């Protein structure tokens, strides 16, 4: 399904003290569907505030974050140092992989290879603004999927803010649930699509003309989706909130259509040790489940998951690994100088309970799969 931000394990540990991080909500039916969806959608504000906190303190450079935080609530909250560092580490890890994907096997000029990114449960993510504004992106096709209420709100924000409107120009309403733009020679699409519908649509076909057939669902259509170019499927704390079948059906939708496909999955892991149990308990107190966390609790489980889905080359690193290996000593010093971090051991525990798994199959990815490996 799609949806805005859901509190991740980093944030839930500190929710009692006001610290929340960014996650991608979308599933699990711990309560009634409407109530659960509302809970997920409400956490988008927490995530955008966490992002803005990291920006305001100098961790990240993101001039667009401010426009997705309600100013009527007063000054944006300042998150705890450990939350700000988590937001920073997660962002730079994904940015590094995405930029590497975009530059892999890439020439300059009119012969450059088109690339496509599909972001699941994008919420208030500012990445498309940052990508299209940083330099010309001819041939980049960028899709975001989320609950319709979220994508509609994003459209209103774009239309209301000149800086955003100047990036996502020529906005067009394609269908009742999808809108698009033509930024910097590229293409942007935003789809109001509950990711759980991928399973419902599949079930409609499988049980067609039987007494057990579920209520008929329309065919899943994503206007502008290309199947002929290298594509990156991004799940930033998204699929972990779907049940196992739903998550697999989302992956299958894309693997069955796009031969040259890569994915990045950012999710929590290790729910069975003492620290993991505490984090899961804190999430459960907020009536939030992470079904795939139970199904893929270890790094190897996550790797096997993607191999089973059809990906040929699979890599992983924990956030702790990425902090140690991808962040230069000079950058670590800069980040430390911003606030300092007293809870070093707690940070290591938190960072060890998040993983980034990236995988690819087919052509058009160059050495993308080996980014940072062995660094």
From Swiss-Prot:
Disulphide connectivity of cysteines: none
GO biological process terms, semicolon-separated: methylation
Catalysed conversion reaction: [phosphatase 2A protein]-C-terminal L-leucine + S-adenosyl-L-methionine = [phosphatase 2A protein]-C-terminal L-leucine methyl ester + S-adenosyl-L-homocysteine
GO MF terms held by the record: protein C-terminal leucine carboxyl O-methyltransferase activity
Binding site for S-adenosyl-L-methionine: 90, 121, 146, 194-195, 236
Pfam family, one: LCM
EC number: 2.1.1.233
Compositional bias ranges of the Basic residues kind: 17-27
Statement: the UniProt record of this protein carries the keyword Methyltransferase: yes
Gene3D superfamilies according to UniProt: Vaccinia Virus protein VP39
Residue stretches of biased makeup (Polar residues): 35-45
Family: Belongs to the methyltransferase superfamily. LCMT family.
General function of this protein: Methylates the carboxyl group of the C-terminal leucine residue of protein phosphatase 2A catalytic subunits to form alpha-leucine ester residues.
Name of this chain's protein: Leucine carboxyl methyltransferase 1
